[in-house]
């Protein structure tokens, strides 16, 4: 058993910063006090928040590790204050049964710097074959990277999903709608027109009608996409638009929208109308992005997600509590994982922030295998220290640990 010790400083607790001494034992929070008494103490200057969770990453292991692997992807995560990631199942060989799930888990082995969970892909009729350790299921209603559209989920699968209490994340673009809008694409505006907001709205209507307990509409790109589900949004849809000179490095699914839609989306996020902020980190090689019409969709973002919004919070553009709720507290809570809160029994995962240390994002300082970021040059505040389960993994802006991330399976019903 590890000896108790205390992490001391100004913690974000109860919606405000307050000096606390948080006792850590065996990687978990064991006490929250003004004075922890006679235990070893580590004091941190700056602001201390619980570390973040990203429920939507594509680290490409196995099958496409020339683009990214769990080592490089998870290292990027912890540099950005994210100690827990959930990896999507659209690998080169999609994770559609328990054998594929086991192979993927085995290929990650001990390479992750962050704690992690894995999704399985629901094809509409394969729920009986899925690994019970899956943190949740992903349904691609419209085709995207390494996936084809699933237009209908069979009733038997819906019953099994609810029986197993799987949260289901939907790629919310209707395949039928996408097919009717296919066109030659030369730029971001064309990509927007080829995958219009109407395709998301059509998918949202279908998802709203599904009798599934926990439904999440992924990467919502327009404030008009609403319904009976939780809503996830990404930094790229909040901060970028199809009028920016990003070329194929701004090509994503769903597409970046026009500036008016983007600004309305950001206003909704600022107003607290979204549940989750995720990166949808989806790296590709430079060859994959070379020619717009044939370029693959996806950008990097796991390292910059939280730092971008810490900078916006410091500028009083985004309320800190909105960032806390959508990037830190809600994501693990929705999946039943005890992270993201300063509460006894929760993992001792923290990030230390110097709000006066604002920097511009520099591709050359990012840790993805292909660090070409559409946010290059934007203001960000990166954590000076990151602590995962009581262990310091980033110290004075540098990683100091070997990979120590652990696999977190879906909590089983008692």
UniProtKB/Swiss-Prot annotation:
Which NCBIfam families does its entry note?
PRK01211.1
Biological process (GO) annotations held by this record are: 'de novo' UMP biosynthetic process; purine nucleobase catabolic process
Q: Where does substrate bind?
A: 58-60, 90, 284
Q: Which PANTHER family match?
A: ALLANTOINASE (PTHR43668:SF2)
Q: Which EC number applies?
A: 3.5.2.3
Give residue numbers for the modification (N6-carboxylysine). 138
* This protein's encoding gene: pyrC
Q: Which reaction does it catalyse?
A: (S)-dihydroorotate + H2O = N-carbamoyl-L-aspartate + H(+)
Write down the superkingdom of origin: Archaea
Residues annotated to bind Zn(2+) 2 = 138, 171, 219
Q: Which residues are noted in the entry as Zn(2+) 1-binding?
A: 56, 58, 138, 280
UniProt cofactor(s): Zn(2+)
Q: Which UniProt keywords apply?
A: Hydrolase, Metal-binding, Pyrimidine biosynthesis, Zinc
Q: Note how many cofactor molecules are bound and how.
A: Binds 2 Zn(2+) ions per subunit.
Cellular compartments per GO CC = cytoplasm
* Function text: Catalyzes the reversible cyclization of carbamoyl aspartate to dihydroorotate.
**What pathway does this protein act in?**
Pyrimidine metabolism; UMP biosynthesis via de novo pathway; (S)-dihydroorotate from bicarbonate: step 3/3
Gene Ontology molecular function terms on file:
allantoinase activity; dihydroorotase activity; zinc ion binding
Question: In its UniProt entry, what is this protein called?
Answer: Dihydroorotase
Identify the species of origin.
Answer: Thermoplasma acidophilum (strain ATCC 25905 / DSM 1728 / JCM 9062 / NBRC 15155 / AMRC-C165)
Q: Name the catalytic site residues.
A: 280
InterPro entries the UniProt entry points to: Amidohydro-rel, DHOase, DHOase/Allantoinase_Hydrolase, Dihydroorotase_CS, Metal-dep_hydrolase_composite, Metal_Hydrolase
Family in the record:
Belongs to the metallo-dependent hydrolases superfamily. DHOase family. Class I DHOase subfamily.
């Amino acid at each position: 058993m590890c000896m108790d010790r205390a992490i001391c400083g100004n913690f974000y607790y109860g919606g405000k910063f307050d000096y606390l001494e948080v006792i850590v034992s065996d990687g978990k929070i064991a006490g929250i006090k003004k004075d922890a008494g006679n235990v070893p103490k580590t004091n941190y200057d700056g602001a201390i928040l619980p570390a973040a969770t990203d429920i939507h990453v594509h680290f490409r292991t196995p099958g496409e590790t020339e683009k990214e692997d769990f080592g490089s992807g998870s290292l990027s995560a912890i540099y950005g204050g994210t100690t827990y990631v959930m990896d999507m199942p659209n690998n080169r060989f999609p994770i559609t049964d328990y054998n594929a799930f086991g192979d993927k888990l085995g290929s990650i082995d001990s390479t992750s710097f962050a704690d992690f969970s894995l999704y399985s892909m629901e094809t509409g009729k394969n729920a009986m074959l899925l690994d019970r350790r899956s943190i949740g299921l992903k349904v691609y209603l419209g085709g995207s990277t390494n996936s084809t559209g699933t237009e209908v989920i069979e009733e038997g699968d819906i019953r099994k999903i609810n029986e197993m209490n799987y949260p289901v994340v939907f790629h919310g673009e209707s395949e039928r709608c996408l097919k009717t809008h296919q066109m030659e694409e030369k730029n971001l505006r064309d990509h927007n027109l080829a995958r219009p907001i109407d395709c998301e709205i059509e998918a949202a209507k279908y998802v709203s009608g599904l009798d599934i307990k926990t439904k999440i509409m992924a990467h919502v790109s327009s404030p008009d996409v609403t319904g009976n589900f939780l809503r996830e949004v990404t930094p790229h849809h909040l901060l970028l638009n199809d009028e920016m000179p990003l070329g194929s490095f701004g090509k994503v699914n769903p597409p970046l929208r026009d500036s008016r839609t983007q600004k309305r989306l950001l206003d909704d996020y600022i107003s607290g109308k979204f549940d989750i902020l995720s990166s949808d980190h989806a790296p590709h090689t430079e060859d994959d992005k070379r020619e717009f019409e044939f370029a693959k969709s996806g950008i990097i973002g796991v390292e910059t997600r939280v730092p971008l919004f810490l900078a916006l919070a410091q500028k009083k553009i985004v309320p800190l509590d909105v960032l806390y709720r959508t990037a830190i507290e809600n994501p693990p809570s929705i999946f039943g994982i005890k992270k993201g809160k300063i509460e006894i029994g929760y993992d001792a995962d923290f990030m230390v922030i110097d709000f006066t240390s604002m920097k511009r994002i520099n591709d050359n300082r990012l840790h993805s295998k292909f660090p070409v970021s559409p946010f290059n040059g934007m203001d960000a505040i990166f954590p000076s220290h990151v602590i995962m389960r009581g262990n310091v993994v980033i110290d004075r802006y540098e990683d100091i640990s070997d990979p120590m991330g652990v696999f977190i399976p879906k909590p089983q019903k008692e």
